Amino acid sequence: LSDAPLDEATAKYWKAMTSGGSTGRPKLIVSKDPATVEPLGEKLGLVPEQVALMPGPLYHNGPFSMGMIALQYGYHLVITSRFDASETLALIEQHGVQLIYMVPTMMQRMWRLPSSERDAYDISSLRLAWHMAAPCPAWLKEAFIEWFGGDVLMELYGGTEAQGFTTISGTEWLAHRGSVGKIVEGYSLKIVDSEGRPVPRGEVGEVYLLPDEGQGVSYFYIGAEATADVGGWESLGDMGYVDDDGYLYLTDRRSDMI
């Protein structure tokens, strides 16, 4: 056998998640990025070689993607077989967790614990607590900003297809209550009316996203056909508006409107 080093071997696609969207037939959403260090990690504030906790199921895009990006950054990854509010806090203390992924349902269950139980755990190691995947009630957001800290609690809005993302910190949210953040560098966002025309700031329309490199650079479907507007813009089906500072606010789902 040769002593020569092996050629580098990298998977062509780093993930293929299943999804049916809100009402559609199941399909595979295949990421076009190779299985290398994900550049989104830097935009999410990840720092190499820390500890991450993913209490959500890895067959969901959020915890899978956040967990795999953390592994690529050299994190020690802590996972659970099911979510338990008390166990989550205990694991943060036990492992000195610096990064955690949550959805609002998890946050509500954690907040429903008696205050004496919540306060019994040391969660001071947390640097980033990302929540996403569903709207977060304002009262719950406020409670977690006070509990975790405004620069620790973070929110992300986007889809599995990765056409674009917005992010917002708790501190920013207090100044822009109800917002899901500003568009991340490398992507563009626009709000259009029912005729596809851009609307003025502050006016509600359908939210469209586009990578700066163009439509279709981030994913392809197996079992479905991608649809895009003129110029490659794509919508996740959400309605919303952008304020004068560039912050996005979601107001409804297009499919829920009469």
What does each model-found stretch correspond to?
Residues 1, 27-30, 76-82, 154:
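Short beta-strand->loop structural element characteristic of the AMP-binding/adenylate-forming
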Residues 6-7, 11-36:
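Conserved AMP-binding A3 loop
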Residues 12, 50-51, 127-128, 206:
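Residues that mark the start of a beta-strand
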Residues 17, 72, 98-101, 115-176, ...:
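Gly/Ser/Thr-rich phosphate-binding loop
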Residues 26-31, 37-43, 52, 89-91, ...:
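Adenylate-forming
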Residues 34-51, 59-99, 113:
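Conserved AMP-binding/adenylation subdomain of ANL enzymes
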Residues 135, 175-223:
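Adenylate-forming AMP-binding core of the ANL superfamily, especially NRPS adenylation
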Residues 200-202, 208-258:
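Conserved ATP-binding/catalytic segment of the ANL
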